[in-house]
Protein backbone atom coordinates (compact mmCIF):
# COMPACT_ATOMS: atom_id res chain seq x y z
CA UNK A 1 0.00 0.00 0.00
CA UNK A 2 1.35 3.41 -0.79
CA UNK A 3 2.11 5.33 2.36
CA UNK A 4 -1.19 6.62 3.76
CA UNK A 5 -1.58 10.16 4.96
CA UNK A 6 -2.40 9.68 8.63
CA UNK A 7 -4.74 12.03 10.43
CA UNK A 8 -1.92 13.09 12.67
CA UNK A 9 -2.95 13.01 16.29
CA UNK A 10 -6.53 11.94 15.65
CA UNK A 11 -6.27 9.92 18.86
CA UNK A 12 -4.74 12.93 20.72
CA UNK A 13 -1.89 12.70 23.24
CA UNK A 14 -1.66 9.45 25.19
CA UNK A 15 -0.32 8.89 28.69
CA UNK A 16 -0.36 5.43 30.24
CA UNK A 17 -1.62 5.39 33.83
CA UNK A 18 -1.43 1.70 34.80
CA UNK A 19 0.21 -1.61 33.94
CA UNK A 20 -1.16 -3.51 30.95
CA UNK A 21 -2.99 -0.80 29.03
CA UNK A 22 -4.15 -1.91 25.58
CA UNK A 23 -4.19 0.52 22.66
CA UNK A 24 -4.85 -1.80 19.70
CA UNK A 25 -7.90 -3.69 18.47
CA UNK A 26 -7.73 -6.79 16.26
CA UNK A 27 -9.75 -8.79 13.73
CA UNK A 28 -8.69 -11.83 11.68
CA UNK A 29 -8.99 -11.84 7.90
CA UNK A 30 -12.01 -13.89 6.80
CA UNK A 31 -10.94 -13.95 3.14
CA UNK A 32 -7.61 -13.90 1.37
CA UNK A 33 -6.32 -10.51 0.20
CA UNK A 34 -3.97 -10.31 -2.76
CA UNK A 35 -1.52 -7.80 -4.17
CA UNK A 36 -3.44 -4.88 -5.68
CA UNK A 37 -6.62 -5.34 -3.61
CA UNK A 38 -8.06 -2.10 -2.23
CA UNK A 39 -10.27 -3.87 0.32
CA UNK A 40 -9.73 -6.46 3.04
CA UNK A 41 -12.46 -8.54 4.68
CA UNK A 42 -12.36 -9.41 8.36
CA UNK A 43 -14.40 -11.30 10.92
CA UNK A 44 -16.16 -9.05 13.45
CA UNK A 45 -15.14 -5.72 11.92
CA UNK A 46 -17.02 -3.90 14.68
CA UNK A 47 -14.39 -5.11 17.17
CA UNK A 48 -11.82 -2.91 15.41
CA UNK A 49 -13.81 0.27 16.14
CA UNK A 50 -12.62 1.79 12.86
CA UNK A 51 -13.49 5.14 11.33
CA UNK A 52 -12.49 6.93 8.15
CA UNK A 53 -8.94 8.23 8.56
CA UNK A 54 -7.80 5.48 10.93
CA UNK A 55 -4.61 3.56 10.25
CA UNK A 56 -4.54 -0.23 10.13
CA UNK A 57 -1.79 -2.79 9.93
CA UNK A 58 -2.42 -5.84 7.77
CA UNK A 59 -0.05 -8.56 8.98
CA UNK A 60 0.47 -12.23 8.12
CA UNK A 61 1.11 -13.98 11.43
CA UNK A 62 1.78 -17.56 10.32
CA UNK A 63 2.27 -19.65 7.22
CA UNK A 64 5.99 -20.37 7.19
CA UNK A 65 7.12 -23.85 6.21
CA UNK A 66 9.05 -25.52 9.04
CA UNK A 67 11.24 -28.60 8.62
CA UNK A 68 10.78 -30.64 11.80
CA UNK A 69 12.77 -33.56 10.35
CA UNK A 70 15.96 -31.57 10.94
CA UNK A 71 15.40 -31.51 14.72
CA UNK A 72 18.04 -33.65 16.40
CA UNK A 73 18.52 -32.01 19.79
CA UNK A 74 15.16 -32.94 21.35
CA UNK A 75 13.64 -29.47 21.05
CA UNK A 76 10.23 -28.85 19.52
CA UNK A 77 11.54 -26.36 17.00
CA UNK A 78 12.49 -27.06 13.42
CA UNK A 79 14.30 -25.01 10.83
CA UNK A 80 12.29 -22.56 8.74
CA UNK A 81 12.68 -23.75 5.17
CA UNK A 82 10.37 -21.15 3.57
CA UNK A 83 8.98 -18.04 5.24
CA UNK A 84 6.33 -17.69 2.54
CA UNK A 85 4.48 -14.53 3.59
CA UNK A 86 4.80 -15.03 7.36
CA UNK A 87 5.79 -11.75 8.99
CA UNK A 88 4.87 -9.54 6.07
CA UNK A 89 2.89 -6.44 6.98
CA UNK A 90 1.88 -3.05 5.69
CA UNK A 91 0.17 0.05 7.02
CA UNK A 92 -2.90 1.45 5.27
CA UNK A 93 -5.41 4.20 5.79
CA UNK A 94 -9.13 3.46 6.14
CA UNK A 95 -11.51 5.07 3.64
CA UNK A 96 -14.60 3.17 4.83
CA UNK A 97 -15.67 0.17 6.86
CA UNK A 98 -18.83 -1.91 6.63
CA UNK A 99 -19.30 -3.56 10.02
CA UNK A 100 -22.05 -5.82 8.60
CA UNK A 101 -19.98 -7.37 5.81
CA UNK A 102 -16.55 -6.90 7.39
CA UNK A 103 -15.21 -5.11 4.31
CA UNK A 104 -12.62 -2.41 4.98
CA UNK A 105 -11.90 -0.09 2.05
CA UNK A 106 -8.33 1.19 1.99
CA UNK A 107 -7.71 4.91 1.58
CA UNK A 108 -6.61 6.06 -1.87
CA UNK A 109 -3.78 3.58 -2.12
CA UNK A 110 -2.64 1.67 -5.13
CA UNK A 111 -3.68 -1.54 -3.41
CA UNK A 112 -1.91 -4.00 -1.18
CA UNK A 113 1.74 -4.70 -1.91
CA UNK A 114 1.67 -8.26 -0.50
CA UNK A 115 -0.59 -11.31 -0.44
CA UNK A 116 -2.29 -12.28 2.85
CA UNK A 117 -4.17 -15.50 3.61
CA UNK A 118 -6.85 -16.30 6.14
CA UNK A 119 -5.32 -19.79 6.50
CA UNK A 120 -1.99 -18.14 7.39
CA UNK A 121 -3.78 -16.22 10.15
CA UNK A 122 -3.48 -12.75 8.67
CA UNK A 123 -5.13 -10.07 10.76
CA UNK A 124 -5.96 -6.37 10.77
CA UNK A 125 -4.75 -4.28 13.71
CA UNK A 126 -6.03 -0.74 14.39
CA UNK A 127 -2.98 1.53 14.82
CA UNK A 128 -3.77 4.57 17.00
CA UNK A 129 -2.36 7.94 15.91
CA UNK A 130 -1.07 9.97 18.85
CA UNK A 131 0.35 13.48 18.96
CA UNK A 132 2.65 12.38 21.82
CA UNK A 133 3.14 9.21 23.86
CA UNK A 134 4.13 9.04 27.53
CA UNK A 135 4.64 5.69 29.27
CA UNK A 136 5.83 6.64 32.79
CA UNK A 137 7.72 4.39 35.21
CA UNK A 138 5.39 1.76 36.68
CA UNK A 139 3.06 1.71 33.66
CA UNK A 140 3.00 -0.36 30.50
CA UNK A 141 1.29 -0.78 27.17
CA UNK A 142 0.60 -4.30 25.98
CA UNK A 143 -1.44 -6.08 23.34
CA UNK A 144 -3.91 -8.92 23.39
CA UNK A 145 -2.17 -12.29 23.64
CA UNK A 146 -1.95 -14.22 20.36
CA UNK A 147 -4.93 -16.58 20.40
CA UNK A 148 -4.24 -18.41 17.14
CA UNK A 149 -6.21 -15.96 14.99
CA UNK A 150 -5.56 -12.45 16.34
CA UNK A 151 -3.51 -10.45 18.82
CA UNK A 152 0.21 -10.63 19.54
CA UNK A 153 1.00 -7.18 18.09
CA UNK A 154 1.50 -3.73 19.62
CA UNK A 155 1.63 -0.85 17.12
CA UNK A 156 1.25 2.93 17.41
CA UNK A 157 1.93 5.97 15.23
CA UNK A 158 3.32 8.88 17.25
CA UNK A 159 3.80 12.26 15.59
CA UNK A 160 5.84 13.96 18.29
CA UNK A 161 7.69 13.15 21.48
CA UNK A 162 7.70 9.62 22.90
CA UNK A 163 8.68 9.27 26.57
CA UNK A 164 9.29 5.66 27.53
CA UNK A 165 10.24 5.17 31.20
CA UNK A 166 7.72 2.33 31.55
CA UNK A 167 7.37 -0.65 29.20
CA UNK A 168 5.84 -1.63 25.90
CA UNK A 169 5.29 -5.36 26.25
CA UNK A 170 4.34 -7.63 23.36
CA UNK A 171 5.29 -10.89 25.07
CA UNK A 172 1.77 -12.06 25.97
Q: Where are the language model's segments positioned?
A:
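Autoprocessing Asn-cyclization modules and mimics
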Residues: 2-90, 96-110, 140-150
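Extracellular beta-strand solenoids
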Residues: 42, 135-137, 143, 156-158, ...
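Extended Gly/Ser/Thr-rich low-complexity repeat segments
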Residues: 48-63, 112-134, 167
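Extracellular beta-strand-rich solenoid/capping regions of secreted or surface-exposed proteins
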Residues: 87, 117-131, 143-161
